[in-house]
Amino acid sequence: MTDKIRTVQGKVVSDKMDKSFVVAIERTVKHPIYGKFIRRTTKLHVHDENNEAKLGDVVEVKECRPLSKTKSHTLVRVVEKAVA
């Protein structure tokens, strides 16, 4: 059985938790009436076992089973480190 793992990229907006961080996923949607493209943001709580991701990093995350009330994504890799 070949499952296609759904991954998304986003920017880390908070890394204050232990083994977790919050990532903001940005997407564009078309306004239903006016047709203008608008930026929409979704925040996801992500599990990070080794505390690799830091504030400002661009990361790739994937869906997984629910790990807690809010966490249902895990870190795949850090795509780009934040400039210190």
Curated annotation (Swiss-Prot):
Cross-referenced Gene3D superfamilies: Nucleic acid-binding proteins
Segment forming the signal sequence: none
BP GO annotations: translation
GO cellular component: cytosolic small ribosomal subunit
Domain of life: Bacteria
Gene Ontology molecular function, alphabetical: rRNA binding; structural constituent of ribosome
Keywords: Ribonucleoprotein, Ribosomal protein, RNA-binding, rRNA-binding
Its job: One of the primary rRNA binding proteins, it binds specifically to the 5'-end of 16S ribosomal RNA.
Subunit structure: Part of the 30S ribosomal subunit.
Family: Belongs to the universal ribosomal protein uS17 family.
Name recorded for this polypeptide: Small ribosomal subunit protein uS17
